[in-house]
Amino acid sequence: MKQFLRLRSKLFLILLKNMKPIYTFTKNWLLSLFFLLLLTASVFADQNDVRLAELFRSLKSTENVSRASVFESKIWHIWMEHYDPEVESAMFQGVEAMKLQQYEQAFGHFSLLIKLAPDYAEGWNKRATVLYLLGRFKESEADVMRTLELEPRHFGALSGQGLIKIALQDWTGAIYFLESALKINPHMYGVIMNLKYARQKQKESMT
């Protein structure tokens, strides 16, 4: 656990220096988002936590950007939590591999995590992220859909599926998933920009 906390501190400093604009469609952006979400991680719950319902209601209803950011961070905090030390270890090793851009190794660690905790939504979401970075979009889609089966409110997975659809130039699919993400969390500027991009590309494809 101490190693995990030290890693989060190091990642925060790296992120402050190197974070890319959220609306760019690059591997660096996705890694920046991944590590940003990691900063609020703990180890004692998951997507079934009873605190989430009220947080989602507050996130959707607030018009205050600062408050929305707080609610969103709390949701990610809970999603990242888990009680099992083996799951925690697999998550740590997967994150460490991603930090070194060792995506195949990260895939192995997150696959072990999924084997240990097949009903832990964030495990599937993390492996989906690695698969996206490896360019294995169809496999990434499958893991995203499993994430959504376990946590239908996972706006991160929905927006991630939107990015996959953009990569595949499936503009209709991209629009659907990005809109779905914004229905749950309407405050994601990067997703709003991605949606505008997908709509523009769809319009161009029809002319």
Question: Which residues are covered by each model-predicted region?
Answer:
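Terminal, low-structured helical/coil segments at or just beyond the last alpha-helical repeat
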Residues: V50, S61, V70, H77-E81, ...
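Residue-level signature of tetratricopeptide-repeat
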Residues: R127-A128, Q161, L195
